């Protein structure tokens, strides 16, 4: 739970800093965060006289790819389903199944949306579930309703667009 809270707090602090820049300071890019769970090797990998403290491993790679995927998915924080299962949060919204750059195995991803009501989050979850189940009637009903509600929400509209381009069991491939 603390890792997800820290990821969201880091994103929010970065965005506040970016938005509150003093006049005359060049604009900064959007803050993005990826969160995954797994084993990692952490330590000093530098030589004598050169400290290079880092973390290595597949979980670190996946978190890095999730961070990069935010740009394409029009989100700020992406959390893998594995990390979300441990997060203990009720504000996470499924953003579908994606194949991350350089990865063969698709990942189900979620994003925090505390700005949405539980009903809105449940509607988005129903859309993703209908697509995953191959229930075209339920999917079209959900997509139509969500388009009316979230027509100006870039991440939700892009989710619908991605799901429209994939079939049951497929993932959206991020390049």
Model-flagged regions — what are they?
Residues 40-42, 63, 70-132, 136-175:
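Cytosolic regulatory/linker segments at or just downstream of nucleotide-handling modules
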Residues 1-33, 37, 58-71, 81, ...:
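Alpha-helical scaffold within the catalytic cores of cyclic-nucleotide enzymes
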Residues 53:
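Catalytic tyrosine of NAD(P)H-dependent dehydrogenase/reductases that use a Tyr as the general acid/base
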Residues 44-47:
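Cytochrome P450 core scaffold surrounding the K-helix E-X-X-R motif
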């Amino acid at each position: 739970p603390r890792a997800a809270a820290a990821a969201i707090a880091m994103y929010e602090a970065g965005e506040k800093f970016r938005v509150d820049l003093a006049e005359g300071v060049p604009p900064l890019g959007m803050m993005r965060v990826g969160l995954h769970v797994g084993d990692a090797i952490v330590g000093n990998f530098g030589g004598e006289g050169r400290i290079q403290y880092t973390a290595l491993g597949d979980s670190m790679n996946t978190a890095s790819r999730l961070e990069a995927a935010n740009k394409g998915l029009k989100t700020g924080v992406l959390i893998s389903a594995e990390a979300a299962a441990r997060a203990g949060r009720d504000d996470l919204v499924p953003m579908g199944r994606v194949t991350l750059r350089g990865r063969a195995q698709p990942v189900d991803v979620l994003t925090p949306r505390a700005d949405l009501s539980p009903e809105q989050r449940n509607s988005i979850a129903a859309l993703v579930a209908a697509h995953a189940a191959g229930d075209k009637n339920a999917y079209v009903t959900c997509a139509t309703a969500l388009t009316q509600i979230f027509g100006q929400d870039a991440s939700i509209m892009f989710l619908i667009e991605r799901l429209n381009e994939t079939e049951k069991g497929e993932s959206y491939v991020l390049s």
